């Protein structure tokens, strides 16, 4: 086949999840990205190598990315030859997300700077290095993208996703009462229908490119 679709899973996911998307891309090879990176600076090193090992065997490549997998893709693959992207509940503003988590955990920036890492009661580890990286590496994304967002996403506010959509000329589909994690039968049905709909859409205009 001439085209590959690379699936990039989110936290706690795995490359095998790519199997779900194969029926929608019958004319493509759907490949799960089997990565080990846990931080964006690790993804910055690992993702281009994995991507290029796949891309060299195809004429075109598209990407499906989930949650933090989308953030890693934006951070690490923005300069790659990707024809189109499909983002599911993407994390598009890591600095904002970390700041929100600091509020939830009642942690000040000075405390985080001093301790470097703080374990929260909700299972996440706040990292000073992570916050600094997010600030020092603002995302730039110019690849035609379709985004699926749950109305009740607890990690990314609507205003944040809307700003990203406007800035990148992406399309946005919102599931009423949808969550960050699409996993129920109803949510997966909505996701599948979104994929089908997105496949029929064509970006008429190119995303605004920075000089």
Residue ranges and their predicted role:
Residues 82-201:
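The alpha/beta-hydrolase serine catalytic core
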Residues 76-77:
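Aromatic pocket-lining residues of Rossmann-like dinucleotide-binding sites
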Residues 6-11, 64, 88, 148:
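Short hydrophobic segments within beta-strands
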Residues 32-55:
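Catalytic nucleophile-loop/oxyanion-hole region of alpha/beta-hydrolase
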Residues 1-38:
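Short, surface-exposed "cap/lid" segments of acyl-processing enzymes
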Residues 202-211:
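Single conserved hydrophobic/aromatic residue that forms the stacking wall/gate
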Residues 64-73:
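Gly/Ala-rich beta-loop-alpha elbow adjacent to hydrolase catalytic centers
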Residues 15-22, 41-44, 158-162:
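Short, surface-exposed alpha-helical segments at coil->helix boundaries
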